[in-house]
């Protein structure tokens, strides 16, 4: 068993990137299984800040091969833009990043349609990043989308792109202002540049498994944004949990060694959708300010609230975590007391599990447990026992409620602001 999977356990922005960065330094291969450049995270390494969107963060490790898997969707110009930004920071990525030839391609027309669909929804808008992710997965599911392998036959490429555009034109008419010929010309320039990066991931990963190489899978988004198990329809368009890993990469369940759920010490969400523990008050504002809760991809302020253990337990039920990484504990250092959600009720009746109906979810009453704050800095802590007693009790309350041990605790933004409890649990 050689595969470690890192997944978001809430609504994204949990800080998966830092743990992925730490684990990538022990890995030979780092993979993305699903999603596109709608996800985003920041890594601080050797005093340099790197922003990642579609690229795996294993690129920070010079000895790590990186794979964008078949379940991903790729906007090729954005791929190169992100790659060039990393290289400007001194990273040598040559021969270390590959895209599956089965991954679907995001075109500019998908991004335009993303915006038009949001306008169509009016007040019921999803709050997408408008990166074209949803429309690309839609054309994938209707079997009309283009994959990376389609880009290298010019005639096939133009025919297939024409069919996609025609379908959107029938729907949106003159509202769709898209120059297909300009896109075709763009890919005449990109085709040769892209060719060295596109591979068949199946033999690549099969060979790695045969050699028992250490493989890291870096999840994008999070379980509560999963198309099947999240707060549908206020979700992304792919399977963001363990299921998406197994279908988006050809690794197989028998290869799994560890499935790690990353949990922020409080809860945040970007975009629309139900958020039972959201705090539209001074507590929410303080979390937003102290936690610097602004999206890497969108620049939007994140909605903030208390830690919701109903969400985390639902996430564990779907992904079967072997360990948790609790992040941004230091953001809570200056609170007198902390609340954690332990159950929901509706019309006086306690609910079992997490509701699938978003209208019901918007009406639930949240039951909280109040825990004492610690009013001491945690950022300097190097070991678990360095943490204040109340902080340790907060960690242990989470463990006992969810039924999974917290193996890593984040107490600051830098790579070394991570406490490992491997020897304590």
From Swiss-Prot:
GO molecular function list: adenylosuccinate synthase activity; AMP binding; GMP binding; GTP binding; magnesium ion binding
Pfam families referenced in this protein's UniProt entry, alphabetically: Adenylsucc_synt (PF00709)
Annotated residues for binding of GTP: 12-18, 40-42, 302, 328-330, 410-412
GO biological process assignments: 'de novo' AMP biosynthetic process; cellular response to cadmium ion; IMP metabolic process
Positions annotated to bind IMP: 13-16, 38-41, 129, 143, 221, 236, 300
Highest taxon listed in the record's lineage: Eukaryota
Record keyword Ligase present: yes
Catalytic activity reported: IMP + L-aspartate + GTP = N(6)-(1,2-dicarboxyethyl)-AMP + GDP + phosphate + 2 H(+)
Binding of Mg(2+), residues: 13, 40
Gene Ontology CC: one annotated term: cytoplasm
UniProt pathway annotation: Purine metabolism; AMP biosynthesis via de novo pathway; AMP from IMP: step 1/2
Names of the cofactor(s): Mg(2+)
Active site: 13, 41
InterPro entries: Adenylosuccin_syn_GTP-bd, Adenylosuccin_syn_Lys_AS, Adenylosuccinate_synth_dom1, Adenylosuccinate_synth_dom2, Adenylosuccinate_synth_dom3, Adenylosuccinate_synthetase, P-loop_NTPase
Cofactor binding, per record: Binds 1 Mg(2+) ion per subunit.
Family: Belongs to the adenylosuccinate synthetase family.
Quaternary organization: Homodimer.
Protein's name according to its UniProt entry: Adenylosuccinate synthetase
Source lineage: Eukaryota, Fungi, Dikarya, Ascomycota, Pezizomycotina
């Amino acid at each position: 068993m050689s595969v470690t999977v890192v997944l978001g356990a809430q609504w994204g922005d949990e800080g998966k990137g830092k743990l992925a960065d730490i684990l990538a330094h022990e890995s030979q291969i780092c993979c993305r299984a699903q999603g596109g450049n709608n996800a985003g995270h920041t890594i601080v390494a050797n005093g340099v800040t790197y922003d990642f969107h579609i690229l795996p963060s294993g690129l920070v490790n010079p000895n790590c091969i990186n794979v964008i898997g078949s379940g991903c969707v790729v906007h090729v110009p954005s791929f190169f833009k992100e790659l060039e930004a990393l290289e400007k920071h001194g990273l040598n990525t040559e021969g270390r990043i590959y895209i599956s030839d089965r991954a679907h391609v995001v075109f500019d027309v998908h991004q335009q349609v993303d915006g038009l669909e949001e306008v169509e929804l009016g007040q019921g808008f999803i709050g997408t990043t408008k990166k074209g992710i949803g429309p690309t997965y839609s054309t994938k599911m209707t079997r009309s989308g283009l994959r990376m392998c389609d880009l290298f036959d010019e005639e096939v490429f133009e025919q297939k792109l024409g069919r996609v555009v025609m379908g959107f034109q029938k729907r949106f008419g003159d509202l769709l202002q898209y120059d297909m010929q300009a896109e075709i010309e763009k890919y005449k320039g990109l085709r040769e540049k892209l060719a060295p990066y596109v591979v068949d991931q199946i033999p690549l990963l099969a060979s790695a498994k045969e050699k028992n190489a250490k493989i890291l899978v870096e999840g994008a988004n999070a379980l509560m944004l999963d198309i099947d198990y999240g707060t549908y329809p206020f979700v992304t368009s792919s399977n963001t949990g363990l299921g998406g890993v197994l279908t988006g990469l050809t690794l197989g369940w028998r290869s799994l060694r560890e499935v790690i759920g990353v949990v922020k010490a409080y809860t945040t969400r970007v975009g629309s959708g139900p958020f039972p523990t959201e705090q539209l008050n001074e507590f929410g504002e303080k979390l937003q300010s102290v936690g610097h809760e602004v999206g890497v991809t969108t620049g939007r302020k994140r909605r903030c609230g208390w830690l919701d253990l109903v969400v985390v337990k639902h996430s564990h039920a779907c992904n079967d975590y072997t360990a948790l990484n609790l992040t941004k504990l230091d953001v809570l250092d200056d609170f007198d007391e902390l609340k954690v959600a332990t159950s929901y009720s509706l019309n006086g009746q306690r609910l079992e599990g997490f509701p699938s109906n978003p209208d019901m979810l918007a009406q639930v009453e949240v039951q909280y447990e109040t825990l004492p704050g610690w009013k001491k800095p945690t950022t300097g802590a190097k070991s678990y026992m360095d943490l204040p007693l109340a902080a340790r009790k907060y960690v242990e309350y989470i463990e006992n409620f969810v039924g999974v041990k917290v193996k890593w605790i984040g107490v600051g933004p830098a790579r070394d602001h991570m406490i490992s409890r491997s020897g304590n649990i």
